[in-house]
């Protein structure tokens, strides 16, 4: 099997960053991204790789995408109770203010992979550019839980935050759910 190749259903996909680019406009940053993604391609082969290997590789691959970015006035990790366990959340406050609108951020990954760390930069940028508090919900993933538990956890976090909004210094009337 070639390095950087994997199977998706009946298709074999090969990522080879040494291939000639289709256009000479590919810059050095994008070339580095293609090289890095090729390094992790084997971990995403669902025919041979394990779920744990895939999640670990995804976390490593995403580190490059999450460095730098805006500084937050406050970053707090919370554990929100739900049905006998807790759901981790991260509150990002971009500026010191008495009350700010809230964006509830539910990361992408198809309910299979990802967390607040793999989507940290986009959360910080969202907070900084919108002026809103961003609450990243680190819902549990398949196969740890079955669908629709992740969505139920997100709803539970929103309800819980609604009951303690004064403690968090957020504006109760302006909320935006966002799944990215």
Each model region followed by its residue ranges:
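Short beta-strand element of the alpha/beta-hydrolase
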Residues: 99-108
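A generic beta-sheet turn/junction motif
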Residues: 82-84, 95, 106
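Short beta-to-alpha linker loops that shape the active-site pocket of alpha/beta-hydrolase fold enzymes
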Residues: 138-142
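Short strand-loop-helix active-site module centered on a catalytic nucleophile
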Residues: 89, 104, 126, 147-180
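Conserved catalytic-core motifs of eukaryotic protein kinase domains, centered on the activation segment
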Residues: 115-117, 145-147
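Short amphipathic alpha-helix adjacent to the substrate-entry channel of hydrolases
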Residues: 117-136
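Glycine- and small hydrophobic-enriched segments that form the cores of compact globular domains
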Residues: 109-110, 133
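A glycine/proline-hinged amphipathic helix-loop "lid/cap" segment
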Residues: 1-91
């Amino acid at each position: 099997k070639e390095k950087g190749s994997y199977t998706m259903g009946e298709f074999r996909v090969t990522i080879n960053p040494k291939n000639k680019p289709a256009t000479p406009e590919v810059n050095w940053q994008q070339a580095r991204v293609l090289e890095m993604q090729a390094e992790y391609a084997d971990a995403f082969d669902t025919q041979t790789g394990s779920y744990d290997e895939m999640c670990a590789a995804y976390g490593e691959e995403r580190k490059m995408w999450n460095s730098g970015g805006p500084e937050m006035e406050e970053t707090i990790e919370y554990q929100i109770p739900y049905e006998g366990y807790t759901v981790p959340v991260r509150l990002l406050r971009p500026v010191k203010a008495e009350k700010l609108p809230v964006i509830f951020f539910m990361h992408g990954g198809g309910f299979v992979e990802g967390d607040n760390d793999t989507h940290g930069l986009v959360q910080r940028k969202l907070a900084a550019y919108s002026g809103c508090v961003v609450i990243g919900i680190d819902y549990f993933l398949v196969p740890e839980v079955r669908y629709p538990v992740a969505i139920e956890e997100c709803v539970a976090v929103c309800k819980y935050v609604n009951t303690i909004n004064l403690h968090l210094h957020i504006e109760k009337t302006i909320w935006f759910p966002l799944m990215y």
